[in-house]
Amino acid sequence: MSTLEQTIGNTPLVKLQRMGPDNGSEVWLKLEGNNPAGSVKDRAALSMIVEAEKRGEIKPGDVLIEATSGNTGIALAMIAALKGYRMKLLMPDNMSQERRAAMRAYGAELILVTKEQGMEGARDLALEMANRGEGKLLDQFNNPDNPYAHYTTTGPEIWQQTGGRITHFVSSMGTTGTITGVSRFMREQSKPVTIVGLQPEEGSSIPGIRRWPTEYLPGIFNASLVDEVLDIHQRDAENTMRELAVREGIFCGVSSGGAVAGALRVAKANPDAVVVAIICDRGDRYLSTGVFGEEHFSQGAGI
């Protein structure tokens, strides 16, 4: 390997050792926090910029715009720094301090909208800025280069790493790029793989997972590529996240806790299954939020 972008992808797949069910099922986790900017979004960020370059839509020195809840922004800021772009990122102001700091460390300009405006407000403002000619909107929610990254890399890696044994794929749904791309790949393989998407229960807030209003549903989402959707409670996502750290040594974020909570539900209901879930990022992006605070462990939550 000679460039940073060549280190994106080919992440490890590891088996749960202590938390898995005792019905013959296996739960495997794809550790996307091992990507250079620390999340699964490195794949989509690279794909969106490289494919736009190939089409002649952007060139180094241009201004790029994107709305993000954190991980995509960090990944885009890294790729922009690597390739010589100016990056403007829009994010709700209730996202963690670590995410803000990482984006700025890569040289990105960060524009905050209010918690009440949320991701919908960030997306609207990003579109307004692009329409005013302030830069090129990458638009991860409607950009086919997002799921294309997972169709060409994540899906094939999982198939190869499981030797084609995978029976269920479980993924959180935010932009839906990961689940859409992986599902497209799995649909083309020699055996059926059940695709399970995760969304927050009504009233739950899980960073990186959304229950989108109809008018904001990502354009890249194809409901026919998802066999089942599970609702995950914020408490279950956070408890599973903490349990992964203390019982499996896997330090990840809240959406990953939700993904594993869903994967365990699927594994328990399907004896002898081979379930693969995506660990989207690392836990160090959430330390300032208090979700790993001592009070949770002293009360036994998630243990």
Swiss-Prot record:
Biological processes, Gene Ontology terms: cysteine biosynthetic process; cysteine biosynthetic process from serine; cysteine biosynthetic process via S-sulfo-L-cysteine; iron-sulfur cluster assembly; L-cysteine catabolic process to pyruvate
Domain of life: Bacteria
Protein's job: Two cysteine synthase enzymes are found. Both catalyze the same reaction. Cysteine synthase B can also use thiosulfate in place of sulfide to give cysteine thiosulfonate as a product.
Subunit-structure text: Homodimer.
PANTHER family for the chain: CYSTATHIONINE BETA-SYNTHASE
Cofactor: pyridoxal 5'-phosphate
GO CC aspect terms: cytoplasm
Entry EC number(s): 2.5.1.47
Pathway: Amino-acid biosynthesis; L-cysteine biosynthesis; L-cysteine from L-serine: step 2/2
Binding site for pyridoxal 5'-phosphate: N71, G174, T175, T176, G177, T178, S255
Disulfide bonds: none
Molecular function GO labels: cysteine synthase activity; L-cysteine desulfhydrase activity; protein homodimerization activity; pyridoxal phosphate binding
Protein species of origin: Escherichia coli (strain K12)
Pfam families documented for this protein: PALP
Modified residues (N6-(pyridoxal phosphate)lysine): K41
CDD domains: CBS_like (cd01561)
Top class in the EC scheme: transferase
Family that this chain belongs to: Belongs to the cysteine synthase/cystathionine beta-synthase family.
Keyword tags: Amino-acid biosynthesis, Cysteine biosynthesis, Pyridoxal phosphate, Transferase
Enzymatic reactions: O-acetyl-L-serine + hydrogen sulfide = L-cysteine + acetate
Name assigned to this protein: Cysteine synthase B
